[in-house]
Curated annotation (Swiss-Prot):
Organism: Lawsonia intracellularis (strain PHE/MN1-00)
UniProt protein name: Large ribosomal subunit protein uL5
GO molecular function: rRNA binding; structural constituent of ribosome; tRNA binding
InterPro entries xrefs: Ribosomal_uL5, Ribosomal_uL5_bac-type, Ribosomal_uL5_C, Ribosomal_uL5_CS, Ribosomal_uL5_dom_sf, Ribosomal_uL5_N
Underlying gene: rplE
Keyword 4Fe-4S: no
């Protein structure tokens, strides 16, 4: 059991149960998975850039990234069906808790001019998405070896039904929201 998961069980669950008046402990929202995605677009035509993105995302996540491919052909983007356009990783269980801890305590504070993450990233069902412009904020990557800076999307999927429940869950876990 990771540090953050233990904190969730001991402190966050009772606080959420008290605040939202859940009758059963099973009603308390939890984090189900975290999805990391790097979309490369046109740059994905270069095998070198694609391999670099896959290896860097694998280093960040701690498990192998898979290539995402185009579902449809779009002539204006010079895109054909099946062409590689990015890579992604889905984290669950212990790796998910480790990554979330690392994201909130190490990576986000390293962002330039960081004042907190926006609360506008909720989707209406309690899930939270945030975009990062530079993936070099993660401690696993050596800044000297990075040739191209890449952005990434991080989606935190929760079992919360409402955005308010999801926000309180992430807030209690320590997500640095803008005040």
């Amino acid at each position: 059991m990771t540090r953050l998961e233990k904190f969730y069980q001991e402190k966050v669950v009772p606080a959420l149960q008290k605040e939202f008046l859940y009758k059963s402990i099973m009603q308390v929202p939890t984090i189900e998975k975290i999805s990391l995605n790097i979309g490369l677009g046109v740059a994905s035509q270069s095998n070198k850039i694609m391999e670099e993105a896959i290896s860097e995302l694998s280093l960040i996540a701690g498990q192998k990234a898979v290539i995402t491919r185009a579902k449809k052909s779009i002539a204006s983007f010079k895109l054909r069906e099946g062409m590689p356009i990015g890579c992604r990783v889905t984290l669950r269980k212990e790796r998910m808790w480790d990554f979330l801890d690392k994201l909130m305590n190490f990576a986000l504070p390293r962002v330039r001019d960081f004042r907190g993450v926006s609360e506008n990233g909720f989707d209406g069902h309690g899930n939270f998405t945030l975009g990062i412009k530079e993936h070099s904020i993660f401690p696993e990557l050596e800044i000297d070896r990075i040739e191209n800076t890449k952005g990434m999307n991080i989606t935190i999927v929760t079992s919360a039904v409402l955005d308010s429940e999801g926000k309180v869950l992430l807030d209690l876990l320590g997500m640095p929201f803008k005040k």
